[in-house]
Amino acid sequence: MANPTLSAIMWGLALLVSALAVLSFARGLAHMWRTVSAGTPDPGRLAPVGKRAWGVVSAALTHRECKGRPWIKAAHWLVMVSFPILFFTLVTGYAQLRVQTFTLPLLGHFAPWEWLTEVFAWGGLAGIIVLMVVRQRAGHGTATEAALSNDDPDGAAAAADPDGTPPSSLSRPHPRDSSPRGLASRFLGSTRWQALFVEWVILIVCACVVVLRGLEYAIFSVTPGLDAHASALHFPLTAWLGALFVGAASSSATSLANAIVLVSALKVLTSMTWLTVIGIQTGM
């Protein structure tokens, strides 16, 4: 299996970062509770409970507000649904820091669950790449972009940011189409670093899940007693990747186990960094 020193170091680091993340998240929850409890209760807010609850759930599941943007709707839906489904891979990740062939009880080798995991790992990865490209192409939400919709773009931009780029250097004419050439980025007013942080967290986590599935296939295929699980039935979308890993590692179980430890640690640390940040930045 994996190098004992490497496994112990990654395990200890994961536990330390996780403890700090939980404390940060608890602090964030307490802050939100204090803020909410400072308000005046509205006895009728929840009524009718069923109708309001269904409205929230149906709006989230159908993404009906994303009208006219089918690709963005599909990408965002895949990313959203991948969150709860891939949570269980985080649990697996902790265990794999110590036992690299670990799988979840009951679900670990349950083919429908494995298919679901891989579909949403790849789907979440593709979805977040689409959303990142859309955000990049939509502009950065700068004062210069916002000024494009003004009757005097250069004057408005200079008033908002004297050192900024004159809108006239970006594009003329300036259609009102929510693009960098038009009314400005649709993300105007959002905090860009927060968006980039969330996007990269999702990208890294989904990529780690895909890579780990391939590594699991590889280590199962070279481990006596587990090789029966190394098949397309259990790894429908990552068996090809696992075969590449087997060849690259020259069928060395130790090399594959070390790789599992490193990728699992990256996934855990990335997830806990996200938990820490949202505990500090409760307005994200």
Task: Tell where the protein language model's regions lie, with residue ranges.
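Membrane-embedded alpha-helical bundles of multi-pass integral membrane proteins
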Residues: M1-M284
